[in-house]
Amino acid sequence: VFTLDGADAKDLDDAISISRDGDGYILGVHIADVSHYVRPGSELDREAMRRGTSVYVTDRVVPMLPRPISNGICSLTAGVDRLTVSAIMHIDAQGRTVRSELHRSVIHSRLRGVYGELNDVIARGAESEYAEKYSVLGESLTCAQELYSILLDASGRRGALDMETDEARIILDENGAPRDIVLVERGTAERMIEQFMLAANEAVAQTLRTAGMPCVYRIHEDPSPEKMQAFSVFAHNLGLDITPLRGDRVTPAALSAVLAEAERRGIGSVVSVVLLRSLMKARY
């Protein structure tokens, strides 16, 4: 079991475990069990409900829960036991979740991983200055990379949209004044965790649906014909092949095909932004 977050993260609220299972894998996503410490109707619960979320600004965090909880007892610190809720997924070689289970659990993280460090290990292998640190993961790291690739391929076959948009980070000086704005780079490590969290979300949603329990779902409706027509004109003017966009209903696979061509031609970012604005807003 290990965590993987940004270098500045203080509240480590999720961890993963992974092992080989025949031709497939067993993926565990472990989320800090805040409900063990924050009881329904308590003062902490009411204050958390009032705040709604933790607010992340440039150089600080206004937490939803007191720091001794979010950064302390509920942070999945390496080397100590922590209470979690775990989604255990059995995933086959085609990226299909064939079985999943949800459990209250106790985990003991072996490593506090950092995105940038792991990206360096993935890129440079044994030559990375972080190779020794991540060697404790053994075959788990190999399995994680293999499963990430499998899930990504499965997502592509389903026609899932992978829209990369640039995220900016403001660099402050010692007085708290902005001195630079840089683009945040997303590497394999970030995308790998994203895929694993999506798999866990789908497993939880499927479990609740099967049990007939009420649940809030995030829904993206089909884009309007007018917005798709405008996007088609935009893409055509850039010289992109819009053949996949013709028809009565534009599918995610069709949009993915246009995005893929845009990426190959080095204009993926701008096309992703325009496409994002053409899609319907999510509703719950």
Residue ranges, per PLM feature:
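Conserved, carboxylate-rich catalytic/transport cores that coordinate ions
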Residues: 1-284
